[in-house]
């Protein structure tokens, strides 16, 4: 009869179908959860390059993608993916970027202090900006700042125009940023003695 186990210990077709349905449901749940997690982040593809490798039978082509992922609230990461197809390279880059997440200290939508980042031949200078200034940055530095959630900043590239160098220089500069509380504790002073009055007013308005 349908749904009953056979005497030899095997299962009927109905039982196997139910088991497969349960497995398929779990896979769908995991897939939906991963899609929800990805939808929470901002992804920007900075550059896609086609690279070739010379082998015995000829040339073997693949693609590389430089991807930036952030939540728009201070978390950002950069990843570099390589695959035989462009979508796979972008996906690998996004996964690596999420593994490289770091937090950017900000006050009222801008960075806490001037900083200069360097990576290879790339040099990027960043300065805090007043509210309403916007993201004054071009090239590959802009998507990094936008994914991090920086709203007002003055940024200028002083070195190489290579997108990979500019992105890594921007990330290096953002990683040098310190919160005002950390600077005050390191110097053994109060927050009012270290932070400028403009930053203190911005923090007070943000907390209010």
UniProtKB/Swiss-Prot annotation:
Keywords: Ribonucleoprotein, Ribosomal protein, RNA-binding, rRNA-binding. One of its GO terms (biological process) is translation. Residues 1-38 are annotated as: Disordered. InterPro entries: Ribosomal_Su5_D2-typ_SF (IPR020568), Ribosomal_uS5 (IPR000851), Ribosomal_uS5_bac-type (IPR005712), Ribosomal_uS5_C (IPR005324), Ribosomal_uS5_N (IPR013810), Ribosomal_uS5_N_CS (IPR018192), Ribsml_uS5_D2-typ_fold_subgr (IPR014721). GO terms for molecular function: rRNA binding; structural constituent of ribosome. Part of the 30S ribosomal subunit. Contacts proteins S4 and S8. With S4 and S12 plays an important role in translational accuracy. This is Small ribosomal subunit protein uS5. It comes from Corynebacterium diphtheriae (strain ATCC 700971 / NCTC 13129 / Biotype gravis). The lineage of its organism: Bacteria, Bacillati, Actinomycetota, Actinomycetes, Mycobacteriales. The gene is rpsE.
């Amino acid at each position: 009869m349908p749904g009953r186990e056979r005497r030899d210990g095997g299962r009927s077709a109905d039982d196997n179908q139910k088991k497969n349905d349960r497995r398929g449901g779990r896979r769908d749940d995991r897939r939906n959860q991963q899609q929800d997690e990805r939808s929470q982040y901002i992804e920007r593809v900075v550059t896609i390059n086609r690279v070739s490798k010379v082998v015995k039978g000829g040339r073997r082509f693949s693609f590389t993608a430089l991807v930036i992922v952030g939540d728009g609230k201070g978390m950002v990461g950069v990843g570099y993916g390589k695959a035989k197809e462009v979508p796979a390279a972008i996906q690998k880059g996004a996964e690596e970027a999420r593994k490289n997440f770091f937090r950017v200290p900000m006050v009222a939508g801008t960075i806490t202090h001037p900083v200069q980042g360097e990576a290879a031949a790339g040099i990027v200078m960043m300065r805090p900006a007043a509210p309403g200034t916007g993201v004054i940055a071009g090239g590959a530095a802009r998507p990094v700042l936008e994914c991090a959630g920086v709203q007002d900043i003055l940024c200028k590239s002083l070195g190489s125009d290579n997108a990979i160098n500019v992105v890594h220089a921007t990330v290096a500069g953002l990683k040098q940023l310190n919160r005002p509380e950390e600077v005050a504790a390191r110097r053994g002073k109060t927050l009012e003695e270290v932070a400028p009055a403009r930053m203190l007013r911005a923090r007070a308005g943000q907390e209010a």
